[in-house]
A protein has these predicted regions:
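Extended, subdomain-level signal for the structured scaffold at the beginning of enzyme domains
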Residues: 1-124, 132-135, 152-154, 162-164, ...
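Residues at secondary-structure transition points
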Residues: 105-108, 146, 177
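Short pre-catalytic strand/loop immediately N-terminal to key active-site residues, enriched for Gly-Thr
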Residues: 119, 169-174
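Structural detector of well-ordered beta-strand residues that form the stable sheet scaffold
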Residues: 124-125, 146, 163, 174
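Active-site-proximal catalytic alpha-helix in oxidoreductases
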Residues: 131, 174-190
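A conserved active-site-flanking secondary-structure segment within enzyme catalytic domains
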Residues: 140-169
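Generic recognition of short, well-ordered alpha-helical interface segments
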Residues: 146, 150, 181-184, 197
Length: 254
């Protein structure tokens, strides 16, 4: 056997955008704690992480049960930087989505971690189906939130008001719709934390200027074959509904 890998360190911004006139930096970096899990949709995580990497005085901690490679839906793995036991308290709690998120709705350790982090976090953030984890932990009850359009309606079963918008802010919660909306959410958060000018500079550095070949990225505008698109996710949505129902029963029983 070869030597054991070193424990990775949290990721700090390596090329941050400075805030003009922001004054003295805080005593410690802003802490963003992200939850990683098997079969995470990689762009849900990596898109916002790219924005976070350019925010000034910011640390990104990536948590999972163990420090070991975690497979994504993209065919590659990501190595967490910390465990649920060792993660620091977050200023921003961030949950990406993916099919693996629904498996975590029944993971008591993960839900307890989210509640513990939420007790002190100023921002509760999610992308895509990551909002279901926040909801299952009781952190979105009575609030507006969004998710991927294919699962959005299921949020209501967890006491959430489903809202079909790209980014939804309600109190401490800021949720993004499906997958690519994560970049929009992260830029909005950057603007809230560091000012609009700083967020615009990050957007320019990333050359985030979407110009898709088709206007088919939202159900309200798409001229794609809606029946086929819905049929392809119908079976998955039915299974997800069963998991959400069990999570709702536990939430309401508590």
């Amino acid at each position: 056997m070869g030597p054991s890998p070193q424990t990775p360190q949290s990721t700090q911004s390596t090329h941050p955008i400075d805030d003009a006139g922001a004054g003295a930096p805080p005593e410690r970096p802003l802490r963003i704690v992200a939850v990683l899990f098997p079969h995470v949709t990689q762009l849900d995580f990596t898109g916002p992480a790219q924005v976070f990497s350019r925010m000034p005085h910011t640390e990104l901690h990536v948590a999972w049960h163990r420090i070991e490679p975690v497979p994504t839906d993209g065919g590659f793995s990501i190595l967490p930087t910390t465990t649920f036991d060792d993660a620091p308290q977050a200023d921003v709690l961030f949950i990406p989505g993916g099919r693996g998120a629904f498996e975590l709705l029944e993971d008591a350790t993960v839900l307890a971690f989210l509640r513990r982090q939420a007790a002190t976090a100023e921002h509760l953030a999610s992308v895509c189906t990551g909002s279901f984890l926040l909801a299952a932990a009781g952190l979105l009850e009575g609030r507006r939130a969004t998710s991927h359009w294919g699962s959005l309606h299921l949020l209501e079963r967890l006491g959430v008001t489903p809202t079909a918008e790209r980014v939804v802010r309600d109190g401490p919660a800021i949720t993004a719709a499906g997958i690519s909306a994560g970049i929009d959410f992260a830029l909005r958060l950057a603007a809230e934390l560091h000012g609009e000018d700083a967020a615009k500079r990050i957007q320019l550095q990333l050359e985030y200027d979407p110009d898709p070949p088709f206007d088919a990225g939202a159900p309200s505008r798409s001229d794609a074959d809606d029946e086929l698109a819905h049929a392809q996710i119908a079976a998955m949505t039915e299974l997800r509904g069963e998991v959400v129902d069990r999570a709702a029963a536990r939430l309401h029983a508590g």
